[in-house]
A protein has these predicted regions:
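S-adenosyl-L-methionine
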Residues: 1-115, 119, 161-169, 179-181, ...
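Core alpha/beta nucleotide-donor-binding catalytic domains of modification enzymes
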Residues: 113-114, 118-149
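Short internal loop-to-helix segment that lines adenine-nucleotide cofactor pockets
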Residues: 56-79, 121, 125, 137-139, ...
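Short, glycine/acidic-enriched loop or turn micro-motifs at the edges of active sites
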Residues: 47, 83-85, 106, 131-133, ...
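Conserved beta-strand signature within the Rossmann-like core of class I S-adenosyl-L-methionine
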Residues: 210-218
């Protein structure tokens, strides 16, 4: 009970802080431009996660970018599902040949397009759609305090997903096998706040041809957003990938051992921003 109260208070104060920042800037300053290690970015100051880290720390996801760079080169093709405003996509695009970016949130997508142009990136092809198991229209909530946390309306819509009273809209979702037919990607990164399960079900052909798959792994997303079991989630991982790296543990495992570790993490509620399946 005390833990639940702590998180409710934490979310409450985050929401209040976000609103105060927005109010302080006034109606004529809905965005800010910041120069960072990742590039130059137009950000939403109300976003206290990725945007705030870019503004305050001058960087975001540095370790993740370094990790990804080990699996690609200047001839590689990359697919990022959940590109947000481009804080990872833009620096990664400088390391590869071609990058396809999928972003469902229309507000984030506008910033993504702006940031691609601002950084003179010519090898990113961006799409404002959601990834799912089939072509459909889904209910999608636009979070503001953590705009990267925007997601399809969860099956179990816990307070942690709604504390900032997100607007709910309808957006178009597609199977990426159908939307990006005959596409080959050396590396696929999926970070879409619990919809990874649905996205992977709709991109089996893409996944069978990739060399590296990076997927956000948060037990509460798998349970509450997708409403599935861990085994359902893992059944989507392509069988040809034989190793699993868990960055938060700084360890690479054979796939069978790694799956056992993931089961333990799932039971204890521990996640990782991007577990890596590879060879």
């Amino acid at each position: 009970m005390l833990k639940s109260l702590y998180w409710r208070l934490n979310f409450f104060f985050k929401n209040r802080k976000s609103k105060r920042l927005k109010k302080r800037l006034g109606n004529n300053s809905s965005t800010l431009t910041v120069n960072t290690k990742n590039g130059t970015f137009v950000i939403d100051p109300a976003d206290l996660e990725v945007s705030r880290k870019l503004a305050v720390k001058g960087e975001y996801g540095t370790e993740e970018i370094i990790q990804i760079s080990k699996f690609i080169d200047n001839k590689s093709t990359v697919l990022i599902v959940g590109a947000h405003i481009g804080s990872l996509a833009i620096p990664i695009a400088k390391l590869c040949s071609e990058l396809v970016a999928i972003e469902a949130n229309p507000n984030n997508f506008k910033l993504l397009e702006t940031n691609i142009k601002l950084n003179n990136i010519s090898n990113i092809l961006a799409h404002n759609i959601a990834a799912s198991e089939k072509e459909e229209i889904i209910q999608f909530q636009l979070n503001t305090v953590n705009s990267g946390g925007s997601k399809r309306v969860p099956i179990n819509n816990h307070y942690m997903y709604t504390y900032d009273n997100p607007e709910v809209i309808e957006i178009n979702a597609y199977s990426l096998d159908d939307y990006l037919p005959k596409s080959n990607f050396d590396l696929v990164l999926i970070d879409i706040e619990g919809s990874e399960y649905f996205a992977m079900r709709g991109m089996t052909q893409i996944l069978t041809k990739t060399n590296t798959l990076i997927v956000e792994f948060l037990p509460h997303h798998i349970t509450n957003v997708a409403g599935v079991e861990l085994t359902d989630f893992l059944n989507n991982i392509p069988k040809h990938l034989t190793k699993l790296t868990i960055p938060s543990k700084a360890t690479t495992y054979p796939i069978d051992v790694g799956v056992t570790i993931l089961e333990q993490m799932f039971e204890s509620g521990h996640g990782d921003d991007g577990i890596i399946f590879h060879n």
